[in-house]
């Protein structure tokens, strides 16, 4: 959920509060297995997710799909209603328990693991009837929580320099759970164990910044599978406690600075600066970082690139998937002019690129780089080249090579690689490239295009 930036001026009385999405953490420090890319299908219903696992995510090589919060939530026409739970029943607008279970099973059959965006910092504001028929009022969620289960501070967070205020007061007026309390910890773990019983493979912990790290560690220790993938949304702020590094003991932490700086480099500076992108920039260790070009909050608040940046956005995703730092998320949502607008058709996706669904995970330039990443996993960066400005190229050992041209003119040159001699398919243009016995090839890249070769595709 949103730590600071809201999607709009929202009325508390109507429970109208937007919460920024939190990068989640993984117990494994990065997703386990050889496929570490997650497709974040934001506000897709579970029937649509299941179909996409079979038709696209599995064949493309995605390791994970992240689904939006499944718990019953407040009613309303905004996307952020999903982030205001009123019970832990799987009864949100995206599907019921049967649809959720079927989705998990279908994705597993396609070789794709399932991560759940999990809201455990707070419950809703306001009062009313939830999407699954449960009645609630703020601080009273029958059969689940009552007033003693919430933090004593019932005021909104006002001071991000004050750790206690950040972690014990209310995020945009939402009822803040006392996660230091035994019953609350037990109840949250019960919810997550229920999801594990349905086959989920991991969790993204929304608004983790607002939960003490020791509370999350305690909750995680109660899981039936304590090795579940675990990634946490902890937003770095200069001079602000808590710090992302406090949370790496339980899993991955999403590295917001990576996304912020990527926007600045691609729009104001030079791609040549990316030669040492990652830990040398002061970021978390690659083994504990979750990275992204944008997420559902940042695409709306302007702090990162988003789909409206067109080719610049595409190239940033190509770079992220080619560069060996962190575990990448590919944000895949829908068009919006109103940043609060809920998904088209209640989250049902009949087809990509229709009815406003952007399906970034399926854009050929992005989807093709998932296999590139899988093929080059563990290989170092080699053969770096740049023109001092916005054309760069680099290899991934003997397994792959990428060139990106963010200049306004065509770049034609001979590239030196560490690839074995032979023919390769440029998965960006779907054309064949021949590498000679010295590891060289010549290519012309038009403005705002890329080239990517890997040893998993030797023909087009």
Swiss-Prot record:
The Gene Ontology biological process annotation of the record reads: carbohydrate metabolic process
Descriptive protein name: Alpha-amylase
Signal peptide (residue range): 1-21
CDD domains membership: AmyAc_bac_euk_AmyA (cd11317)
Gene that codes for this?
A: amy
Name the residues annotated as site: Transition state stabilizer: 297
Pfam families linked: Alpha-amylase (PF00128), Alpha-amylase_C (PF02806)
Q: How does it assemble?
A: Monomer.
